[in-house]
Amino acid sequence: MKLLVVDDSSTMRRIIKNTLSRLGYEDVLEAEHGVEAWEKLDANADTKVLITDWNMPEMNGLDLVKKVRADNRFKEIPIIMITTEGGKAEVITALKAGVNNYIVKPFTPQVLKEKLEVVLGTND
């Protein structure tokens, strides 16, 4: 299963990718910002999950989510936002934009596992 991780921090991308690898997800694409993420998503339409930060240069995560949701190819792709923006207003804004689940940094691998299971419908 192909996943796309978007974060301007190479350290955070590595942490997320390593966590996904331990969970059995090996086909993980990476992008540094929303513009690069859109290009990768456009070229890899078989991507099954998008995991994105909010605050990034060039195109932030919220604008990326809106662009993804506006494209019929990706209307149903599960999106998890992982960000430091943890206020109620931010969560509501993200959910209204089309985010399926929300994780506030810092987070544990267990939280990412559970959120992935929820968006993929594999939770028991």
From Swiss-Prot:
It is found in: Cytoplasm. SMART domains: REC. Its cofactor is Mg(2+). Binds 1 Mg(2+) ion per subunit. The keyword Transport does not apply. PROSITE patterns: RESPONSE_REGULATORY. Residues 2-120 form the Response regulatory domain. It comes from the Bacteria. Phosphorylated by CheAY. Dephosphorylated (inactivated) by CheZ. InterPro entries: Bact_response_regulator, CheY-like_superfamily, Sig_transdc_resp-reg_receiver. Mg(2+) binds at residues 7-8, 53, 55. One of its GO terms (biological process) is chemotaxis. GO terms for cellular component: cytoplasm. It holds the Pfam family Response_reg. Keywords: Chemotaxis, Cytoplasm, Flagellar rotation, Magnesium, Metal-binding, Phosphoprotein, Two-component regulatory system. One of its GO terms (molecular function) is metal ion binding. The modification 4-aspartylphosphate is found at residue 53. Interacts (when phosphorylated) with FliM. PANTHER family: RESPONSE REGULATORY DOMAIN-CONTAINING PROTEIN (PTHR44591:SF3), STRESS RESPONSE REGULATOR PROTEIN 1 (PTHR44591). Chemotactic response regulator protein that modulates the rotation direction of bacterial flagellar motors. Plays an important role in the colonization and infection of Helicobacter pylori. Upon phosphorylation by CheA, interacts with the flagellar motor protein FliM to cause clockwise flagellar rotation and bacterial reversals, as opposed to straight swimming when CheY1 is not phosphorylated. This is Chemotaxis protein CheY1. It comes from Helicobacter pylori (strain J99 / ATCC 700824) (Campylobacter pylori J99).
